[in-house]
Regions:
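N-terminal BTB/POZ boundary and linker segment
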Residues: 1-63, 112-113
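Weak global preference for isoleucine
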Residues: 4-5, 14, 22, 69, ...
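Intrinsically disordered, low-complexity N-terminal regions enriched in serine/proline/glycine
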Residues: 10-11, 15, 106-108, 124, ...
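Canonical BTB/POZ domain core
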Residues: 48-137
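Alpha-helical oligomerization segments
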Residues: 123-159
Length: 159
């Protein structure tokens, strides 16, 4: 079991090669291909690589390594550590905001930015952002958070 506690030093090397890529094929192509099957794989016990438990939540998530390591240096490190332990089928993590994780995880699988955007509100936006930052998610996820901030929070403050 791999347990990671949020701290100041949770940043991981982004140049870690998570999977063996075919030379000349960008990682974004692999992610696009995975996301085409994302709805089928999201939280699917039958096809999952591991059970993911988030401290503070009672519901487990059934996750697939490839979806997560392509998008998060945090998960790259988690799966690297888990592969070196005797039991890599259960992963336990601690996040800044457990209650906003499920929609974020679904977004990582499907890439459905509108659905994820719609789960944000004034009360949870900052918590969503904390998870995005903690997991080291890339420009795409950050842009969705930024769009929410601009469209919903700044707009309402100006009126």
């Amino acid at each position: 079991m791999a347990t990671i506690i949020p701290s100041e030093d949770h940043y991981y090397a982004i140049n870690y090669t998570p999977v063996d890529f075919i030379e000349g094929v960008p990682a974004t192509y692999f992610l696009f291909s995975l996301r085409e099957q994302g709805e089928l794989h999201f939280n699917n016990f039958d096809t999952a690589d591991a059970e993911l438990r988030v401290e503070g939540l009672t519901t487990p998530f059934w996750v697939h390594k490839d979806y997560l390591i392509l998008q998060s240096p945090f998960f790259r490190e988690i799966f690297r550590e888990a592969s070196q332990s005797s039991d890599d089928s259960l992963i336990v993590i601690n996040l800044p905001s457990p209650e906003t994780f499920a929609p974020l995880l679904e977004y990582l699988y499907t890439g459905n930015d509108e659905k994820w955007y719609d789960t944000m509100d004034r009360n949870n936006y900052y918590d969503v952002w904390l998870n995005v930052d903690f997991l080291g998610l890339g420009k795409e996820a950050r842009a969705i958070c930024f769009a929410y901030y601009q469209n919903e929070i700044l707009e309402s403050e100006e009126t």
